[in-house]
């Protein structure tokens, strides 16, 4: 879900539920699911409910528990509502506007639609320009609104919403996992390359759940059925209660699942494409120990996404695993903060070293990535200040050298510490004794059970979809100029 008003990208979480038995409070179920998906987006959230064909909703800036007070949640809860959708969103500073929050609800001549989107269109600028030339008026800066316009336009010309979605997919490029709710249908859609995860669950009393991750199914009592396949449209018709799959409407390019889902974004208790995220991260640690062995006394991980890889490194190397940091639970993830200054400030209060674990010891420190380098340097300094004799940094991903255009907040190349630098030069910046990255050869082997290929463009620069359209266009420049005057680019 990209923002034209700010040239960075975001990660989000989507959810949808249809309760056939009519025994669930679907608004409360969506609330629980969004709690489980909160790690995917912390700037805004929303829920839309379908009460006998009438769709209403609430969305705003803030965390799930901030936006959905007991009073707000009660206003959405009715005994006759059997469908709901939900969304959590992350975006960059300068785009924190309510208009970009989701679900987006569209009312048109043939009904109402609520839409949730995770991903980023690479041709959204061109599509938006075409729509504006045809008279469309946009209220926000999100490419999700482009998708809403296109589906609505096609719906007015076609006999069903799924046909309109299929027609819309013909012109969309890039990453999109969608959950869409109409008066009588709940629909899940995944782009043909399957960049972003999307799964299907079944409710005990009958009905279905769609979610970005299986951890949201667990939160609602649903059982994981399967993943939505790349290019697939899954339709739940509430008139029949049946689930229907549409697969023959688009081409079948090679799957490009974002490998960063396994490395960092997803919760470790989730299962994606048949593979446990927890096990995939442990496998990354085992590969790291094979590729970059070192003599040390203890292996520690950076909470939270570095812990599983550290455990794998310990198991493979035989070096004892230890708890090296205590994490402040009340501060967000540094990678998902609005500005570079916010990131730096949050590191200072986010982690505290368990000195008894590291004092006087040779430490293997495992983390999931190095993007800008500021967080890594600060963490290494914390360990040295606590008495660590040596710090050997191991990273469970290859170096980030290129920006992402498919829904991950990785900035342009000039802000990436690995751009134009080799491993030794990066290590000089972060201050470790040694530095080792996971190889691109092994990173695509993390999820052994996954029957899909992976996108590694942020490591290799090899994009399955050319990203030129999001880099330099008149409409992009115009929206940049129209952003709030107090909005600053990352790193300013």
Each model region followed by its residue ranges:
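Conserved short alpha-helical segments that host acidic/polar catalytic motifs at enzyme active sites
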Residues: 1-230, 235-238, 242-296, 302, ...
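Flexible loop/turn segments at secondary-structure boundaries
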Residues: 92-93, 123, 187, 195-196, ...
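Generic beta-strand/beta-sheet core signal
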Residues: 116, 181, 189-190, 201, ...
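Secondary-structure transition/capping motifs at alpha-helix termini
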Residues: 136, 157-158, 293-297, 315-322, ...
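A conserved beta-strand->alpha-helix junction
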Residues: 140, 145-148, 321-332, 429-447
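Phosphate/diphosphate-binding loops
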Residues: 167, 215-216, 220-224, 231-232, ...
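PRPP-dependent phosphoribosyltransferase catalytic core
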Residues: 169, 184, 221-227, 381-492
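Short, glycine/charge-rich flexible loops or terminal/linker lids adjacent to PRPP-binding catalytic cores
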Residues: 318-363, 374, 401-407
């Amino acid at each position: 879900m990209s923002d034209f008003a700010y040239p960075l990208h975001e990660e989000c979480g989507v959810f949808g539920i249809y309760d056939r038995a009519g025994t669930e409070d679907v608004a409360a179920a969506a609330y629980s699911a969004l709690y489980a998906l909160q790690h995917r987006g912390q700037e805004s959230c929303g829920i839309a409910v379908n009460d006998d064909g009438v769709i209403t909703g609430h969305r705003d800036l803030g965390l799930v528990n901030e936006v959905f007070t007991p009073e707000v949640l009660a206003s959405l809860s009715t005994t006759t509502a059997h469908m709901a959708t939900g969304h959590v969103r992350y975006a960059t500073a300068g785009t924190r506007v309510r208009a970009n929050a989701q679900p987006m609800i569209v009312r048109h001549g043939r009904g109402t639609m609520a839409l949730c989107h995770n991903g980023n269109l690479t041709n959204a600028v061109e599509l938006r320009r075409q729509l504006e030339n045809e008279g469309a008026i946009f209220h926000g800066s999100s490419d999700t609104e482009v998708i809403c316009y296109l589906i609505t336009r096609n719906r007015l010309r076609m006999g069903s919403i799924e046909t309109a979605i299929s027609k819309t997919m013909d012109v969309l490029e890039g990453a999109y996992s969608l959950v869409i709710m109409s008066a009588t249908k709940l629909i899940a859609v995944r782009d043909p390359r399957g960049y972003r995860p999307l799964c299907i669950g079944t409710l005990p009393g009958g009905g279905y759940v769609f979610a970005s991750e299986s951890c949201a199914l667990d939160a609602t009592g649903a059982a994981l059925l399967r993943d939505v396949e790349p290019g697939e449209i899954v339709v739940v018709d509430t008139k029949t209660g049946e689930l229907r799959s549409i697969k023959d409407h688009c081409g079948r390019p090679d799957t490009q699942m974002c490998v960063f889902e396994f490395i960092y974004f997803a919760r470790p208790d989730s299962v994606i494409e048949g593979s446990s995220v927890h096990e995939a991260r442990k496998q990354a640690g085992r590969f790291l120990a094979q590729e970059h062995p070192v003599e040390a006394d203890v292996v520690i991980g950076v909470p939270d996404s570095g812990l599983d890889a550290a455990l794998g490194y310990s198991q493979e190397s035989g070096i004892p695993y230890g708890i090296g940091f205590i994490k402040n639970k009340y501060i967000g993830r540094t990678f998902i903060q609005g500005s570079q200054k916010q990131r730096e400030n949050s590191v200072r209060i986010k982690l505290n070293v368990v000195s008894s674990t590291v004092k006087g010891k040779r430490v293997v420190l495992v983390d999931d990535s190095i993007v800008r380098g500021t967080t890594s340097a600060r963490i290494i300094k914390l360990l040295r200040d606590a008495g660590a004799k040596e710090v050997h940094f191991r990273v469970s991903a290859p170096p980030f050298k290129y920006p992402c255009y498919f829904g991950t907040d990785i900035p342009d190349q000039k802000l990436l510490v690995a751009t134009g630098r080799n491993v030794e030069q990066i290590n000089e910046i972060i201050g470790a004794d040694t530095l080792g990255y996971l190889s691109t050869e092994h990173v695509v082997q993390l999820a052994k059970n996954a029957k899909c290929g992976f996108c590694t463009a942020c490591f290799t620069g090899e994009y399955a979809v050319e990203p030129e359209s999001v880099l330099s266009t008149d409409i992009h420049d115009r929206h940049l100029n129209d952003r709030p005057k107090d909005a600053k680019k990352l790193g300013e």
